Amino acid sequence: EGSGGSGSSGHFTTGSNVHMSSVTNTSNGGTGGTGTGTGTGTGTGTGTGTGTGTGTGTGTGTGTGTGTASGTATGTASGTATGTANGTGTGKGTDTHTAGSGSGSGTGTGTGTGTTTTTTTGNNSSSSTPPVTLTESLLNK
């Protein structure tokens, strides 16, 4: 409520009916966002394997001898021959070998990094009541 006041143009009194309005604002929070991400990774692995192989060798030898006794010769895989009783001998040998075979298995581990993007949407609203109404009574104008 207002009280009386004086002015250069006259005396006036403000009436007692003063209505103030109230203003309310409401705001709704934004809704949650969705995000997608992609990542790439590299990994290293180690493996162990075992293999087996077999080989065989054969040898032949020939010998000749001179003297009172005949010569003998033996052959080994490396192909050597000896002679006895004044005899000399030579020998030749051959080796055959099959290649070994093996198998192995390994395991690997990797790490990756990714990026994620997020978007968020929201809405806001506000409302208010009608403005102030003022009733005045002017006297002695």
Curated annotation (Swiss-Prot):
| Compartments (UniProt record) | Nucleus; Cytoplasm, Perinuclear region
| PTM remark | Phosphorylated with a circadian rhythmicity, probably by the double-time protein (dbt). Phosphorylation could be implicated in the stability of per monomer and in the formation of heterodimer per-tim.
Region listing for Disordered, in residue ranges: 1-141
Q: Where is the composition biased (Low complexity)?
A: 69-85, 114-129
Q: Write out the GO biological process terms.
A: rhythmic process
Which parts of this chain are annotated as the region 32 X 2 AA approximate tandem repeats of G-T?
30-94
Keyword Nucleus attached: yes
The sequence repeats lie at 30-31, 33-34, 35-36, 37-38, 39-40, 41-42, 43-44, 45-46, 47-48, 49-50, 51-52, 53-54, 55-56, 57-58, 59-60, 61-62, 63-64, 65-66, 67-68, 69-70, 71-72, 73-74, 75-76, 77-78, 79-80, 81-82, 83-84, 85-86, 87-88, 89-90, 91-92, 93-94
What are the alphabetically sorted keywords of the record? Biological rhythms, Cytoplasm, Nucleus, Phosphoprotein, Repeat
> Disulfide pairs?
none
- Provide a GO CC annotation, any one: perinuclear region of cytoplasm
Polar residues composition-biased segments: 11-23, 130-141
Q: Main subcellular localization, coarse class?
A: nucleus
> Which segments show compositional bias classed as Gly residues?
29-68, 101-113
Note the coiled coil stretches, chain numbering.
none
The UniProt subunit note reads as follows: Forms a heterodimer with timeless (TIM); the complex then translocates into the nucleus.
Which comment does the entry carry about domains? The run of Gly-Thr is implicated in the maintenance of circadian period at different temperatures. Deletion of the repeat leads to a shortening of the courtship song cycle period, and thus could be important for determining features of species-specific mating behavior.
Function noted in UniProt: Essential for biological clock functions. Determines the period length of circadian and ultradian rhythms; an increase in PER dosage leads to shortened circadian rhythms and a decrease leads to lengthened circadian rhythms. Essential for the circadian rhythmicity of locomotor activity, eclosion behavior, and for the rhythmic component of the male courtship song that originates in the thoracic nervous system. The biological cycle depends on the rhythmic formation and nuclear localization of the TIM-PER complex. Light induces the degradation of TIM, which promotes elimination of PER.
What's this protein's name? Period circadian protein
Its lineage reads:
Eukaryota, Metazoa, Ecdysozoa, Arthropoda, Hexapoda
